[in-house]
């Protein structure tokens, strides 16, 4: 999901430089090769062009609401057993966490799966097929969390240790904080290779 307007950020955060590449590249990497179908739903022409260069399917739209983004994306994925809604502004989400969510879903495909840190649920959220009708008919402006909240008995969480994985970069300050963590981790990785 890459359809936010970036009002609090003050611009197109998806294309903001995150360690030498657009921030959206991080979420594309975290989901690469894991799904039969992958689709970026966005209002950003720049993000759409970047995805096309990487051969990632894109649905470019101009609709204003989160419920519109969910509906458009799910409509394109309706023949799947499950659908992962991943915000594109969560740059520290890892491939390992997304892979673990998929493994959990394979063990219990009737549950709504989401990561949680210290008991606090976050995104992305993996929805099973039974929830598609509710997602397609979300109240105006609501997102998938609305469906999860309506079915708390069917929500399962995957514990993650790093709370930064679940953080959004909604403001320039949050972006700078997450970028700093990313760059420090990259430096540590580089020093281990020496």
Residue ranges and their predicted role:
Residues 1-121, 151-162:
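Nucleotide and nucleotide-moiety/phosphate-recognizing core
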Residues 7, 48-49, 133, 167, ...:
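Alpha-helical elements of the RecA-like P-loop NTPase motor core of helicases
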Residues 98, 131-135, 175:
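A generic structural signal for short hydrophobic patches within well-formed alpha-helices
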Residues 137-194:
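Conserved alpha/beta core of the MobA/IspD/sugar-nucleotide pyrophosphorylase nucleotidyltransferase superfamily
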Residues 123-127, 167-169:
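Short glycine- and hydrophobic/aromatic-rich loop-to-beta-strand nucleating segment
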